Regions:
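Conserved RNA-binding domains used in RNP assembly and mRNA/RNA metabolism
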Residues: 1-85
Length: 85
């Protein structure tokens, strides 16, 4: 299974998710990124569903709230894919 995921810093949390842009025009300040299947990553690399207390598997956020976006390590990506199954 080929999955393109990103590791991003959002609200002082590390999140691994599939990131897409919102289609169509958006106004400044409007959410413009979709995080699909987001999981929070703790310091040991364990994953937990994000956001907590929600069953939503797609979360729309503002790209301006993302402070860092990088590719996840191979181990983290493998753990993420396993969590999706």
């Amino acid at each position: 299974m080929e999955i393109a995921a990103n590791l991003l810093r959002l609200s002082n949390e590390w999140i691994v998710a599939q990131v897409d842009e919102v289609e169509g025009e958006t106004l400044p300040g409007d959410p413009d990124c979709i995080l699909r299947q987001p999981f929070m990553v703790d310091y040991e690399g364990n994953l937990s569903q994000w956001p907590k207390n929600s069953d939503d598997r797609e979360v729309v956020v503002r790209s301006t709230d993302i402070t860092t976006i990088v590719s996840p390590s191979k181990d983290l990506l493998a753990n993420y894919i396993k969590s999706l199954e």
